[in-house]
């Protein structure tokens, strides 16, 4: 009995009216020159010409009388690092984005080595500075790494009062910056 109640309470709750896959369908149109393959209703995979595979999944977030469905772009790989490291990035500059600052949330010593390596490649920082992202995280744990970017565009805002639905499309410039950043980071992590 207790187990059933616990599972029900911990079950993911999606906002009322959320339809899995609608935002991904619109994003797929923005990624038209690239091959997209559906993995499930809430996730798909982008396959770049060089063979890099990027996973995209929907991330719904409830608000008062509305909800936002944003898309998270994920990249996975193998590394020689075994320690748990979490690195996040912020863009400095209020009116104009100037530079990216990396900071370590977990695994300070090894994390600082990864941050130093990221800072040795200014092109990655310049690309990320121009990219409009909400959240950017690099997780490393037990020889695996995962890079996740939540973009401001490629998201949908659904309001119940007044009833409306608005998709913020991923422009071709932002698509280029996003895919370039993911490709460069994949190449960099291959060196670790």
Language-model features and meaning:
Residues 12-15, 33, 49, 122, ...:
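Proline-rich intrinsically disordered, low-complexity coils
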Residues 2-26:
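Active-site acidic/histidine clusters and adjacent loop/turn architecture
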Residues 40, 80-192:
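Charged, low-complexity intrinsically disordered regions
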Residues 17-110:
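Soluble extramembrane domains of integral membrane proteins
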């Amino acid at each position: 009995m207790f187990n059933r109640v616990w599972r029900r309470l911990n079950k993911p709750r999606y906002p009322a009216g959320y339809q899995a896959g609608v935002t991904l369908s619109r994003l797929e149109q923005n990624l038209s020159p690239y091959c997209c393959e559906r993995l499930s209703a809430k996730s798909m995979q982008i396959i770049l010409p060089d063979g890099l595979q990027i996973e995209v999944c929907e991330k719904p977030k409830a608000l008062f009388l509305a909800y936002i469905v944003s898309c998270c772009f994920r990249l996975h790989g193998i590394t020689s690092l075994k320690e748990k490291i979490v690195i996040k990035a912020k863009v400095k500059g209020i009116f104009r984005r100037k530079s990216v600052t990396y900071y370590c949330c977990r695994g300070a010593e090894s994390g600082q080595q990864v941050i130093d390596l990221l800072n040795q490649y200014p092109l990655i920082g310049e690309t990320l500075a121009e990219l409009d992202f909400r959240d950017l995280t690099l997780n490393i744990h037990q020889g695996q790494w995962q890079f996740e970017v939540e973009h401001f565009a490629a998201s949908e805002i659904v309001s119940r009062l007044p009833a409306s639905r608005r998709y913020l499309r991923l422009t071709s410039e932002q698509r280029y910056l996003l895919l370039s950043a993911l490709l460069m980071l994949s190449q960099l992590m291959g060196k670790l």
